[in-house]
Design a protein with these regions (language model features):
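A general structural signal for short secondary-structure junctions and capping/turn motifs
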Residues: 152, 178, 182-187, 236-239
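Low-complexity, glycine/alanine/valine/leucine- and proline-rich hydrophobic stretches
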Residues: 192-273
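Long, charge-rich, low-complexity alpha-helical segments
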Residues: 1-180, 253, 258-315
Length: 315
């Protein structure tokens, strides 16, 4: 009678021994794959793996049990810690997006986002960097408000960029003396973010902030407590489409938003792209109006304000 063939051994999820840096990297990848899988609705690590195997079987290849916890339970601690931390970080970073979608839909959106674009940085600061792209790629999570949510994700990421990007020595009026406008190239501060939006999300964000500050404010009597609770529960009305140009900037470590005239936006964007001052002005002002006295006064006012805000820098 022919000998029965043994079934093929199951491929290991993680290396059995760590004898090299390659083995260590494989073990780390296996652990990351396990703990970064989304939690169940009960906030537990799934009991079954994608191929139907018990997750405990895979966990045993990564972590040893101890006298208190199984291998599965030990890894579940890391999984829950990871998911609670990254979800909480995005929750705090995206108040406008959360207000526009409502908390249940927002939580589903960011979980789906983290599955496709998990953290790849040592800092949580970079976690929302690809959220606007994801909203465009997967509109099913934000319909029928995808365009608004895309603007909000861009705006809220811009605020993060502004907060800790570099600030260079400012460009002063003295630096303009004897300069030829045809050759002069100004530089904008690295932290300055210029946004062309389809919705007035700057006003929406401010309304959300005011609502949240009222709901968090300390109340000293029953009437104030009641008012704070009503404010917290109140929804901020989603804005209607309106072409909007905004500069997000900072002064003394505080972030500000400044509305821009479309022509002012075009001038600043041209400067940001490395155009000369003359080219930037041509890009911003229609040829038929570039000698109009009103436009000259308007442009002078813009540049005076931008200089006062320290938007131009030396490089």
């Amino acid at each position: 009678m022919p000998a029965q063939r043994k079934p093929p051994a199951k491929k290991r999820f993680a290396p059995e021994h760590v004898r090299s840096t390659a083995d260590l990297a494989a073990l780390q990848r296996a652990m990351w794959t396990l703990i970064s899988r989304p939690l169940t609705p009960a906030n537990r690590m799934p009991r079954r793996w994608r191929d139907g195997r018990p997750t405990a079987e895979l966990a045993a290849q990564i972590a040893k049990p101890n006298d208190r916890l199984t291998s599965f339970e030990r890894l579940e601690i890391y999984s829950r810690m990871y998911w609670f931390r990254v979800l909480d970080s995005l929750y705090e970073d995206c108040p406008g997006l959360r207000a526009a979608l409502g908390q249940p839909r927002f939580m589903k959106l960011i979980e789906a986002y983290l599955v496709k674009y998990p953290s790849r940085s040592f800092t949580l600061r970079n976690l929302p960097s690809r959220l606007a792209r994801f909203i465009r790629e997967k509109p099913q999570w934000t319909r029928p408000h995808t365009a608004l949510c895309h603007d909000l994700a861009r705006f809220e990421w811009a605020r993060i960029e502004v907060f800790d990007s570099a600030a260079l020595p400012v460009f002063t009026v003295d630096d303009l003396l004897d300069a030829n406008p045809a050759r002069l190239k100004l530089n904008l501060q690295p932290y300055l973010q210029l946004l062309q939006l389809d919705y007035p999300v700057d006003e929406f964000i401010l309304a959300v902030k005011q609502r949240d500050e009222l709901s968090r404010g300390e109340a000293s009597n029953t009437a104030l407590v009641h008012a704070a609770r009503k404010a917290s529960a109140r929804k901020v009305t989603r804005p209607k489409p309106e072409p909007t140009h905004v500069a997000v900037h900072r002064m003394n470590s505080t972030i500000y938003f400044k509305r821009l005239d479309p022509a002012a936006y075009r001038i600043l964007r041209a400067i940001q792209r490395g155009k000369s001052l003359e080219q930037a002005l041509s890009a911003g002002i229609p040829a038929a109006k570039n000698s109009d006295g009103d436009w000259v006064a308007k442009i002078q006012g813009w540049f005076r304000t931008w200089m006062e805000l320290g938007w131009f820098c030396q490089r």
